[in-house]
From Swiss-Prot:
Its cofactor is [2Fe-2S] cluster; [4Fe-4S] cluster. GO terms for biological process: iron-sulfur cluster assembly. It comes from the Eukaryota. Its main location: cytoplasm. Component of the cytosolic iron-sulfur (Fe-S) protein assembly (CIA) machinery. Required for the maturation of extramitochondrial Fe-S proteins. Part of an electron transfer chain functioning in an early step of cytosolic Fe-S biogenesis, facilitating the de novo assembly of a [4Fe-4S] cluster on the cytosolic Fe-S scaffold complex. Electrons are transferred from NADPH via a FAD- and FMN-containing diflavin oxidoreductase. The keyword Ribosomal protein does not apply. [4Fe-4S] cluster binds at residues 81, 84, 92, 95. One of its GO terms (cellular component) is mitochondrial intermembrane space. Belongs to the anamorsin family. Monomer. It comes from Leishmania braziliensis. Residues 33-119 are annotated as: Disordered. This is Anamorsin homolog. Keywords: 2Fe-2S, 4Fe-4S, Cytoplasm, Iron, Iron-sulfur, Metal-binding, Mitochondrion.
Length: 119
C-alpha cells in the first residue's frame, strides 16, 4: 500500500476565516427577550430586587427580623457590589473601602472602635 502523494490541511493559520455577525444570528424574538431580561441594579433602589443575587435581600430579611431596618430601606455602599462590609477579600476592585477593616453594613462604612481601657 502506498500513501497518497498530497496531504490536505484541516486548518490554516495563514488564511483568515470570516467571522459570523452575532446580531445576524439573533431573531427579533431573541432581541426582545434580551432587553426584557436586563434587570435593574440593586444600588439604585430602596429595597432589594425580587430576584436579588447580590445579598441585599438576605441582609434586609436579617435586619427586619432584628427590627433594625429603617422604613426607607438600607443604602448600599458606593462600591455597588454589596460586599463592601465583609472586608478586603470580598470587595470589588473599585471599592471605596479598600484597605479598611470589615464593618457592619448598617453603619455606612464607619468602624466602631472600642476605646475603653482593658484594665
Amino acid at each position: 500500500m502506498s500513501t497518497p502523494a498530497t496531504t490536505t490541511q484541516a486548518f490554516s493559520l495563514k488564511t483568515r476565516q470570516p467571522i459570523a455577525d452575532e446580531d445576524a444570528l439573533l431573531t427579533e424574538e431573541d432581541r426582545i427577550l434580551k432587553q426584557a431580561t436586563k434587570g435593574e441594579d440593586c444600588t439604585t433602589r430602596r429595597r432589594a430586587c425580587k430576584n436579588c443575587v447580590c445579598g441585599r435581600a438576605e441582609l434586609e430579611r436579617k435586619l427586619e427580623a432584628e427590627g433594625k431596618l429603617p422604613p426607607e430601606g438600607i443604602t448600599m455602599p458606593p462600591g455597588g457590589c454589596g460586599n463592601c462590609a465583609k472586608g478586603d477579600a470580598f470587595r470589588c476592585a473599585n471599592c471605596p473601602f479598600l484597605g479598611q477593616p470589615a464593618f457592619d453594613s448598617t453603619e455606612d462604612g464607619k468602624v466602631k472602635l472600642n476605646l475603653t481601657d482593658d484594665i
